[in-house]
Amino acid sequence: FSGPKYNDYCMNYTIDLTSKIFPNCEIIVSTNDRNLASAVANNPLVNKLIISDNIGELPSLKYPENSSKIINNNINKQNVCCLKGVLAASHNIVLRIRTDQVLLNNNILKIWDLSKNFPSPLGRKGKIITSSIFSINPRYSERMPYHISDMLQFGYKDDIISYFSVPNYPFEYATWYERNPHIEYSNKLERTFRSKFAVEQWLTLHYIFNKEENFPIRFHNDFNDRIIDDFENNFIDYFIIAHPKDIGLRAPKFKDAESYYSTQCYSTFEVFKLLENKYPNTKITSTNFTAKGMNKKYFNKLMPIIYSPFAQFLIKRLSTENKNRIKRILNHLAK
């Protein structure tokens, strides 16, 4: 587990649950939050407690709508905690997960077994399983290739060490669009970015291409049909993206985003479909899983309406109650 202490519940409960779901596992808590360290220090199930210095955050990834919505870019301090925790692991297979998330079953092991049926790229021992939450499909409203979720990793220790062994994100990149214009075709969502890349892109691009000079994209929404096709052909050799429902992932902080990540992010079904197309001789098929989110045929027709300036103008002026009502409807449609 890596991250800070959350007030939602005591983390000792998720530690206990994890030890039951994965018998004989080694539990490591890696944090820069002294309050969390104190809360779990006496838990006999915690095999290793790693406390790092808080190296601070960068300016917010996106331009906030107002001062109360500032969420600073924590990529560098996140990587310190994650990497130290993974390096300390004694086992060859590692699950790295946020402190506010937990797996409620061991279904991830079934997907892990399925992933072994497909080849791995040179220099990698296997694939890393991650979640759909913000593993963005760039064919929809946010055209950002290589934006694969950084919230959870399950895979070989050496691969996850490589994933987090990236250069520090530069301050110049964190403030990129303060000095550089967004590319002309950027939509409203893409123009909210202050940072040159998303955190998820910085990690994924380095993991796949090793050095920035090899990156196939120049900035967060650098895309065209060829870039997207290459992205989908590449990432499936390195990652399996799994929908939370397929791996029993509890992520309450992102419950309101369920309709978004179920419809506009990659699901287990879609990833195995891509693998099936690339490796047609394998016996594993996408029929092991079900499609998530709204029917893409209908969503493609709805999306231009939902994201039109007039619709966004109206939505912004709705009361919080009505906005939440719309979210509930979309979440229901996305089930």
Can you annotate each of these PLM segments?
Residues 103-110, 115-269:
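Catalytic core and acceptor-binding pocket of nucleotide-sugar-dependent glycosyltransferases
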Residues 30-88:
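Active-site-proximal specificity loops/subdomain of glycosyltransferases
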Residues 94:
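Short aromatic/hydrophobic "clamp" motif used to bind/position activated sugar donors
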Residues 97-99:
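Active-site acidic Asp-centered loop
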Residues 6-10, 73-81, 195-199:
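Soluble or luminal CAZymes and related metallo-dependent hydrolases
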Residues 1, 26-29:
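Hydrophobic targeting segments
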Residues 6-21:
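Short, well-formed alpha-helical segments that are part of the catalytic scaffolds
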Residues 261-335:
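Membrane-proximal basic amphipathic "stem/tether" segments
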